[in-house]
Curated annotation (Swiss-Prot):
The lineage of its organism: Bacteria, Bacillati, Actinomycetota, Actinomycetes, Propionibacteriales. Its EC number is 4.1.1.23. This is Orotidine 5'-phosphate decarboxylase. It comes from the Bacteria. It catalyses: orotidine 5'-phosphate + H(+) = UMP + CO2. NCBIfam families: PRK00230.1, pyrF.
Amino acid sequence: MDITRPIIALDLPSAEAALDFVGRFDGENLFVKVGMELFYAAGPSVVTSLKEAGHDVFCDLKLHDIPNTVKGAASSLSRLGADLLTVHAAGGRSMMEASLEGLGDAAETTRVIAITQLTSTSPEALKTEQLVDVPLVESVRNYAKLAQAAGLAGVVCSAHEAADIASVTGPNFLRVTPGIRPAGSAVGDQSRVATPGNAASMGSSAIVVGRPITKADDPVAAYHAIRDDWNAGRKA
């Protein structure tokens, strides 16, 4: 699993749409994200189909339930061949540890990372809606340390928190960043965004990009441009 490739978020309405989309890349091995929209519309078989087509799959369902339920869900997803899974760090250490137990024999090939704070969460929303009276970066840092203590491979975080997380967890703890927008793109419903190159220079280990690729007039060209910007930032 090469997590240094930009991960394409397949926020599409059906398995057919997803497979047609990846088919436009002429056999190129992609890393794609299956989130709630596609998974709930197409069912588990979409993960299997994407794997059979030669792609790595990030199954981003943000598991958050009692430990035994999350353990069972992680087991099911790992058997589908998912390379990367997400759980909510807010579920607690026991729940995160249970997700790893659920991997069984797939623990060598499937990694679990934790959601810290969604990139749509603003500092104001953290305080007024979640009633968390600490700076957003401190909340993210706390969740990252908790996830590492539970044995997870990394976290999902914005580029703005990536360097801070690396400072408390070490460089090998993954920092997977959504909310990526090429220069000049619309921000949409994201609150904390960055360009691919900026995310690399700010310490992200991997990036997730959806609409700037899937909604582009030429998705293949858009993907390659984002990949080039990302790689240039990583080498800088």
